[in-house]
Structures are given as C-alpha cells and as structure tokens.
C-alpha cells in the first residue's frame, strides 16, 4: 500500500456527519473532480462534487435494502479534489486527463473501491486509464447516459464531454451504453461499424427483461461503471446539462446496479455531469444517495466472496 501520508483528505468528507475514516482503514475512496470546460448547454457541473458531498450529510447511514451501514462496515475516505477548474479555469483537457489518471491510479493499486464524482463526463477518460493501470485483466465500461458521447471531436476538442466514450473505445475496451436516447449521425455510423450493443431507452421502456439481456451481453467478468446523471429521468434528476426526456427510473436503475454488482466484479465507478439547480437539492441528494447505494452494493459483493 502507498503511504497514507502521500494523500491529502478533502475539506469535506462524504457522510462526515456519520463517520470519518483514515485512508489506511477505508475500503472506499471518494474522489471529487470539479472540472468543467466543454459543457455545451446548461453549465455548473464543476459545482457538482461539492454539492454531492454537502448533500451526503443528510443521508441515513443505515441502508434499509441491505440491512447494513456501509459507511461503518467499509470505511469511506474522501481525497482532496483533483483537476479543479474552479481554481484552475485554464486547465486543458489532456492535462486534466493526466492529472485524474495519476491521482486515482494509486488508489486502484492499493485495492480501494474508487467512486469518482464530477464534473463533466470527459473526466472518465482519466478514471478509466487509472483503472487500466491498476488491473491487468480486461474490463467492460458500462455507460449509463442519455447521449452516445462517441464523437471523435466536438467544438474542436477530442476531450470534449461529447467524445469521452470514443476515447474509451480507443483504449481497446468494450463498452455497453444503456438508456441512450440522443445521438448524432457520426455516432450512429460508429455503432453500426463497431457493432456496439446499445440499449436504447425507447426499447427498454417496453422490455421488462432488459436487465437480464444487458448483463448477459457483458463479455468480461470485470466492469467499470460510468454514470452520466442525465441517463436518469429528468423528472427526479433535473440538475444535468442536457435533460433529455425519458431515461432510467430510480428503482429501475437500482435493480440494474445491484444485479450488476451481484453478477460481475465492479472495479470502480463514477457519477458525472451533476449541475446543481438553484433553489432545489433533489438532484445532488439523489446523486449522493446513488453513490452510497453503489458503495453498499460493492460491499455486499465483497461479503459474498468470504
């Protein structure tokens, strides 16, 4: 394990009202990444991590579904923010990806379960690179998203939030996009060319078996989960950059995530693109609760190995 003195804890800890855990004793590391440079509609996702950490203090430590208190059972450590565009507004995309990768890789190497909170979706390229550095086995990137995010470039940048899954594909990793409901022609052509197994939101709405089909389509045992919060129904998740109609419902999403953790080895996850809405806390609270549910599902999967 890397020396705990190597890492700096953040000014705000996830669920710090319930438990603050040292790096050495924590199984889960929360990584705030308040980076925003390329959002193309509603702005504000650089404020997402801080809002989620603040909202986490309102969560109940006890999870009634799991019958445990994950923050006590696992230990959660929140590191200092990476790639903070609030402090460094000129931080370029390639430099951001490098900083995120170099910052997260030691956590992966130490066997921590990383939960990264953004920030714009372009961040995921750096998170996935860190996962590759920390594991020698192949893994699939499961993508919850309203959009394909598979453009080669957008607005002159290859590290635009609309290009992140194209960069992931270039890393040689299989992907599974879920809840997709908006793509461009370039992305449609790529999906056909690469035979990418997309689960379209309009088809999922009429298919009660989509969870089984989605999990059956994953060809690797290891999985990284990337969640753009606009993958959810904006009726309860309005605080996103582009709130596409439709998307995952709350319990539909939880059912999928729990099954995913039960059947696959989830090596890490991120939650991206939360942009808080002034005068409302529903989006950041729901995101904080989702992050905590994912930690709990991971903990459940670890107990079943014993």
Swiss-Prot record:
Pfam families, sorted: Arginase
GO BP terms in the entry: putrescine biosynthetic process from arginine, via agmatine; spermidine biosynthetic process
An example molecular function term from Gene Ontology annotations: metal ion binding
EC number: 3.5.3.24
Alphabetical UniProt keywords: Hydrolase, Manganese, Metal-binding, Spermidine biosynthesis
Reported impact of residue 151 to A/N: Retains very weak activity
Alphabetical list of SUPFAM superfamilies matching this protein: Arginase/deacetylase (SSF52768)
UniProt-annotated binding residues for Mn(2+) 2: 145, 147, 228, 230
This protein's pathway: Amine and polyamine biosynthesis; spermidine biosynthesis
Gene deletion effect: Deletion of the gene leads to substantial accumulation of agmatine, CAPA and APA, and lack of spermidine. Mutant exhibits arginase activity, as determined in cell extracts, identical to that found in the wild-type strain. The mutant lacks any agmatinase activity.
Co-factor binding details: Binds 2 manganese ions per subunit.
Cofactor: Mn(2+)
Positions contributing to Mn(2+) 1 binding: 121, 145, 149, 228
Effect of residue 60 to A/Q: Loss of activity
Phenotype when changing residue 187 to A: Retains 50% of activity
Catalytic activity: N(1)-(3-aminopropyl)agmatine + H2O = urea + spermidine
Homology family: Belongs to the arginase family.
Function: Ureohydrolase involved in the biosynthesis of spermidine via the carboxyaminopropylagmatine (CAPA) pathway. Catalyzes the conversion of aminopropylagmatine (APA) to spermidine and urea. Is highly specific to APA and incapable of releasing measurable urea from CAPA, agmatine, arginine, guanidine, guanidinobutyrate and guanidinopropionate.
Name this protein carries in UniProt: N(1)-aminopropylagmatine ureohydrolase
Native organism: Synechocystis sp. (strain ATCC 27184 / PCC 6803 / Kazusa)
Name of the gene encoding the protein in the UniProt record: speB1
């Amino acid at each position: 394990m890397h020396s705990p003195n190597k890492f700096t804890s953040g000014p705000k800890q996830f669920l710090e009202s319930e438990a603050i855990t040292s790096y050495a004793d924590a199984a889960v590391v929360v990584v705030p990444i308040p980076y925003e440079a390329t959002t193309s509609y509603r702005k504000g996702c650089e404020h997402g991590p801080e809002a989620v950490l603040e909202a986490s203090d309102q969560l109940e430590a006890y999870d009634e579904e799991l019958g445990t208190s994950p923050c006590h059972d696992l230990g959660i450590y929140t590191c200092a923010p990476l790639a903070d565009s609030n402090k460094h507004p000129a931080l370029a995309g390639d430099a951001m990806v490098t900083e995120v990768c170099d910052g997260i890789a030691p956590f992966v190497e130490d066997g921590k379960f990383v939960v990264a909170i953004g920030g714009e979706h372009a961040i995921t390229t750096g998170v996935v690179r860190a996962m590759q550095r920390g594991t020698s086995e192949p893994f699939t990137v499961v993508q919850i998203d309203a959009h394909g995010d598979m453009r080669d470039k957008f607005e002159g940048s290859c590290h635009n939030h609309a290009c992140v899954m194209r960069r992931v594909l270039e890393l040689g990793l299989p992907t599974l996009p879920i809840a997709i409901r908006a793509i461009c022609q370039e992305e449609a052509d790529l999906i056909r060319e690469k035979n990418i197994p997309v689960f379209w939101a309009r088809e999922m709405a009429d298919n009660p078996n989509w969870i089984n089909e989605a999990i059956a389509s994953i060809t690797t045992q290891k999985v990284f989960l990337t969640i753009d919060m606009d993958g959810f129904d904006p009726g309860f998740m309005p605080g996103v950059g582009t709130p596409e109609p439709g998307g995952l419902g709350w319990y539909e999403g939880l059912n999928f995530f729990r099954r995913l953790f039960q059947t696959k080895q989830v090596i890490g996850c991120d939650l991206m693109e939360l942009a808080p809405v002034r005068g409302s806390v529903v989006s950041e609270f729901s995101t904080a609760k989702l992050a905590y549910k994912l930690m709990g599902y991971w903990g459940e999967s670890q107990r079943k190995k014993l």
